[in-house]
Amino acid sequence: MFYWILLALAIIAEITGTLSMKWASVSGGHTGFILMLAMIALSYIFLAFAVKKIALGVAYALWEGIGILLITLFSVLLFDESLSLLKIAGLTTLVIGIVLIKSGTQKKASSKQEVAHAAV
């Protein structure tokens, strides 16, 4: 559970960093760029710890996919960006892909033989 929380924090940090980049480019201030650098770095740190126990493909798909989905939605709400039917179709496909990747990944059951072999 702890590693899933780290992944959620990585996603939140990525979203915050990317939205800060847009905010900084619109407002012209340097604060947004500093926040962007800090949050993107934090996002990668959280992701690095999360993949210790979460399969890399699953973690990366969730990190990138949920990030893209929420960044797009927040961009529409905060920066008045357009949301076309084609973008909605793309986001829907993305969500379906994330669900398929997550549901297609099973946790490997470790046997006593594997543990004994690893200790040798």
Swiss-Prot record:
Cellular component GO terms, alphabetical: plasma membrane
Protein name: Spermidine export protein MdtJ
Annotated membrane topology: Multi-pass membrane protein
Pfam families: Multi_Drug_Res
Keywords: Cell inner membrane, Cell membrane, Membrane, Transmembrane, Transmembrane helix, Transport
Keyword Transmembrane among UniProt keywords: yes
SUPFAM superfamilies (alphabetical): Multidrug resistance efflux transporter EmrE
Compartment(s) of residence: Cell inner membrane
Single GO MF descriptor: antiporter activity
Quaternary structure note: Forms a complex with MdtI.
Membrane-crossing segments per the record: 1-21, 31-51, 54-74, 81-101
Alphabetized InterPro entries for the sequence: Small_drug/metabolite_transptr, Small_multidrug_res, Spermidine_export_MdtJ
Homology family: Belongs to the drug/metabolite transporter (DMT) superfamily. Small multidrug resistance (SMR) (TC 2.A.7.1) family. MdtJ subfamily.
Entry's Gene Ontology BP terms: glycine betaine transport
Function noted in UniProt: Catalyzes the excretion of spermidine.
UniProt xrefs under Gene3D superfamilies: 1.10.3730.20
UniProt cross-references to HAMAP family, sorted A to Z: MdtJ
